[in-house]
Amino acid sequence: MESERSCLLSSHDAGKGGSSSVSSASFNFINSIIGSGIIGLPYSMSQAGLPMGLLLLILVAFITDYSIILLVRGGNLSGTHSYQSLVRSTFGQIGYIIVSVLQFLYPFIAMISYNIIAGDTLTKVFMRIPGVGPGNILTERHFVIAMSTVLFTLPLSLYRDIAKLGKVSLLSMILTFGILMTVVVRAATLGPQIPASDDAWVFARWNAIQAVAVMSFALICHHNSFMIYGSLQEPTLSRWSLVTHISVGSSVLVSAVFAAAGYATFTVYTQGDIFENYCRSDNLATFGRFCYGVSIITTFPLECFVTREVISNALFKGGELSKSSHVIITLVIISATTAISLSYDCLGIVLELNGILSAVPLMFIFPSACFLKLSNERWCRGENLIASMILVAGVFVMIIGLIMMALFPQDCSHGAEMFYCSASNTSSTASPSNILQFINTTQNTSIV
């Protein structure tokens, strides 16, 4: 394996690099990982049980880290520089078509979810502005989505060099800490006021496989791995491993704290979009919504870069797009995602479906399968054993996840105020006695 490593390192040492430093590439990678999926992680804890959910999150993070490096190693072994070309070199045209469809669908659906979040989140922020009532145009999700597209996501998506998004990604990371602070503070102040059910703290639940799908959606970044790898000033395996470890490690730390704090606050009442749990009159939650809405807008262009690259590889054989082709393809992608997000607003189902159909194959199955086929060792020996286990786990999660999704579909409670919000009309949360009194009254009424 030492000789193989030397070959891998030398294969790109002489290759043409980009303009990104390790820190800039890490910012872009972390921004790609911590996208819309993080908002559903508290709900995944509700599906799996908090202890089991955290264990599964760490396991999925390990698989993410390991398979990202496998992906680039496979690319170096085969002499390819994109996910699609790697799969074509190992599994032929059929494999190329399948992975192209998946690699297109994942970021495309992710962009739809980003628009849904921006529309749902920022409208609630604008409602808190004095003088902005329910009939105001700023409270219309269609208007907010359209304006955020025209003013922000479209101009940023028109960049040709992903390295130019480094500063925007840094801004997104700063905003992410604002979101994290909101959830953690409310776990301490609001959590004790919402009584948990008897099974709120069980070790594990049967819906754990569905939780893995949501976690996979939250942590996947394989679809733009080659793009960020190629943007490094010196694209070597050692530098790429450092970027991967920093990015995945930082992301899973933020994700674990976010998931645990969010679930601890609302337990069995946790929604697919955690911000749907907070009352509209909560000023701190409004700050968190603002941070998340802006963060999502800055993440959108990264996914557009990937979608555009997939189209370029499929239609133009990977050649560099002309300026006019670049603009036209970008406009088509943005228009399509915007049109769909304007007509559909149920986020939870979008996250879970994208996790099972796109994220799991791209994260678990294809990186392991490509590396195993390119490796000369047996599947049951050395590091190939880990790749084999990841491959089997991916197939299992995908099949069982689809079955569980059909048997236990998510409810879409978009825009509904939670019952405990009626107990207080102030921007700060109500006293515990008021909340508990309201909940007990509601429960007694339902029993009668």
From Swiss-Prot:
Residues the record marks as carrying a glycan: N425, N440, N444
Tell me which InterPro entries the record gives. AA_transpt_TM
Query: Mind telling me what this protein is named?
Result: Putative sodium-coupled neutral amino acid transporter 11
Looking at the record, which segments are called Disordered?
1-20
Q: How does it sit in the membrane?
A: Multi-pass membrane protein
Q: Where do the TM regions start and end? A: 22-42, 52-72, 94-114, 143-163, 165-185, 200-220, 246-266, 286-306, 324-344, 346-366, 389-409
Report the superkingdom from the record. Answer: Eukaryota
Annotated family: Belongs to the amino acid/polyamine transporter 2 family.
Q: Does the keyword Transmembrane helix apply?
A: yes
Q: What GO cellular-component annotations does this UniProt entry give?
A: membrane
What the protein does comes down to: Putative sodium-dependent amino acid/proton antiporter.
The record's subcellular location field reads:
Membrane
Keyword Methyltransferase assigned: no
Sorted UniProt keywords: Amino-acid transport, Glycoprotein, Ion transport, Membrane, Sodium, Sodium transport, Transmembrane, Transmembrane helix, Transport
Q: Which GO terms describe its molecular function?
A: L-amino acid transmembrane transporter activity
| Gene (name only) | slc38a11
